[in-house]
């Protein structure tokens, strides 16, 4: 069993964030039929399903149907979003029994000049308050702290934190990654990271790899990859198209290939250029927050 299964439902996004590499793959929205087939094939491998690799999942025009399929398959769903569509999608999200958690990348807004920042933050915190009542977790992400290569990329963090304090004025409680703002509402901190790129510098053969250890991912075209950071399908294990997945006998991906990839003595070139290596900075401590 994997603790995280990723099933990308779209490659499209309504933002152009500096930290996101985007994808050269075609624009796509997974149809409910294909989603049902792929999700059912994934279900024996775990219960916690993340509906993204690339793309903004709240853009999907048939999101209610996808969430209902997740309910029927008894998945616990996490959505990661830039937050801009939360007000419009709130009724759909909070009516979905399968939804467990929404992670909101608040650091996405600083990479985009268009839009009303205060209105954006209000939409995010209003959603979090409504989600509390519905029993859905909200994790606000500020993954933009200074690292060895990423200085000065968090100009609006003070404004964001001030807004969060105003929205959640009860005493905050420290946890491993940040703070608990209220019941079911959190803010987590981390350094901005560079997505693995075959053209980037080699970071070595050792690292904290989770590929095929506690996660795997399926791209919108059905390509199975070892982890959620393989956003172009470079390390494809199998192309599990809807047609392929309808076969009853083969596993989701070739077991021999998966085992070989996991235990390879020489990691693939993409893995040697991944941020999750000893050369990456250690988990950062959150900046001080006034009580």
Label each region the model flagged.
Residues 24, 53, 106, 252, ...:
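Residues that line or immediately flank small-molecule/substrate-binding pockets and catalytic motifs
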């Amino acid at each position: 069993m994997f603790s995280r299964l990723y099933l990308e439902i779209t490659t499209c996004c309504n933002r152009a964030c500096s930290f996101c590499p985007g994808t050269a793959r075609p624009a796509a929205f997974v149809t409910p039929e294909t989603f049902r087939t792929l999700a059912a094939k994934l279900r024996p491998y775990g219960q916690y399903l993340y509906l993204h690799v690339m793309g903004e999942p709240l853009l999907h025009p048939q999101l209610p149907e996808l969430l209902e399929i997740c309910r029927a398959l008894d998945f616990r769903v996490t959505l990661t979003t830039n937050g801009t569509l939360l007000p419009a999608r709130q009724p759909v999200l909070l009516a979905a029994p399968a939804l467990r958690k929404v992670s909101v990348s608040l650091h996405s807004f600083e990479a985009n000049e268009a839009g009303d920042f205060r209105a954006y933050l209000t939409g995010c915190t209003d959603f979090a308050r409504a989600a509390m009542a519905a029993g859905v977790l909200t994790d606000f992400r500020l993954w933009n702290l200074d690292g060895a290569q990423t200085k000065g990329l968090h100009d609006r963090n003070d404004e964001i934190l001030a807004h969060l304090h105003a929205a959640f004025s009860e005493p905050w409680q420290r946890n491993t990654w940040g703070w608990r703002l209220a019941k079911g509402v959190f803010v987590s901190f981390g350094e901005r990271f560079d997505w693995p790129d075959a053209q980037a510098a080699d970071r070595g053969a050792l690292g904290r790899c989770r590929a095929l250890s506690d996660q795997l991912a399926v791209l919108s075209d059905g390509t199975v990859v070892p982890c959620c950071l393989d956003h172009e399908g470079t390390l494809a294990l199998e192309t599990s198209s809807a047609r392929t997945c309808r076969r009853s006998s083969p596993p989701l991906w070739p077991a021999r290939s998966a085992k070989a990839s996991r235990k390879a003595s020489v990691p693939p070139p993409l893995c040697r250029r991944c941020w999750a290596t000893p050369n990456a900075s250690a988990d950062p401590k959150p900046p001080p927050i006034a009580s």
